[in-house]
Amino acid sequence: MSRSRLAKADAFEGRGNEIVTFSIDRNINYTNVCNVYCKFCAFWRREQAADAYVITHAEIDQKIEETLALGGTQILMQGGHHPSLSKQWYLDLLSHIREKFPTINVHGFSPSEFVHFRDVFDEPLEDLVRDFAAAGLGSIPGGGGEILVDRVRQKISPLKAMSDDWLEVMAIAHRHNLATTATMMFGHVETVEERIEHLDRVRVQQDATGGFTAFIAWTFQAENTKLKAPTVGSHEYLRMQALSRIYLDNIENIQSSWVTQGREIGQIALRHGANDLGSIMIEENVVSKAGTVYCMDVADMQRLITDLGYEPRQRDNWYHLVDAPAAAA
């Protein structure tokens, strides 16, 4: 049996042959100021840069209002490792969002950001996760996962959280009943064996704590970054997508990365183990800074799904279906 056929058969516990999910959310980057200078990132700016920014409450209100108007259910909120923002700034932002927009889930602050908070605020990770959750954080994204092998991380992002740190934040989040996602960015300095090691570390963590709702893999986007590597083609992406589904059979949902791969490959990934097409991405800043810009609206996403014979359904962050099924013809 081919990797793609085996992966498809294993997807979504059989439901992958019927339903493909998607979400409506907005990727809000609260600051582009960052002091870890990752070689693979084109988004970061120094604090003194002319185009450095920190989002205001008024700006985030407008972005959330636009998201709600489009039927959105959450915001994905991440940012650079800002050296000067206080812990209270983050808690105030979360409290403000919860008070003004109680129906919006804040899927925010990657493990690497929490490690940054630990170091800057000199507080234990456990306390930070608890306090952020109490202020309104609903779930944690898998950003900063890259490859969970320290040899790789020392080469591409030596000032950012190492593998054990990333996994520790996820374990703490799961203890506090915060759902999280796991990610992998591949196609740079890692070996194939290190990709497998990454998948294995995610799998072992899921066996231990069970809090990963989904896994998302994407390829490194090199344009405008300091890290140069041969471009990973669509065939290699689809192979990794299928392998992820087979290896991570303890994570229910596998998401296609149309944001980095484009519509056609994003759709084909649904035949290579993915059961979710991700978000329409009302706003995206990090990948686009690296030269990759793809856009879709709800109709586009539904069409990609139905063209393969699946039923498109909108979901929330916890993969609960939030729309009514289409009426039978």
Spell out what each predicted region is.
Residues 1-21:
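An N-cap/entry alpha-helix motif that binds or orients negatively charged groups
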Residues 18-28, 75, 106-110, 140-142, ...:
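Hydrophobic faces of well-ordered beta-strands that scaffold small-molecule active sites
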Residues 20-59:
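Canonical Radical SAM [4Fe-4S] cluster-binding loop centered on the CxxxCxxC motif
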Residues 11, 100-104, 176, 209, ...:
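Helix C-cap/helix->beta junction micro-motif
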Residues 1-2, 68, 200, 206-329:
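Auxiliary Fe-S-binding modules of radical SAM enzymes
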Residues 45-197, 201-204:
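Conserved Radical SAM active-site core
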Residues 22-28, 48-51, 78-88, 150, ...:
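Glycine-rich, proline-tolerant flexible connector loops at the mouths of alpha/beta enzymes
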Residues 8, 12, 68, 98, ...:
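N-terminal cationic-hydrophobic initiation segments that often serve targeting/anchoring roles
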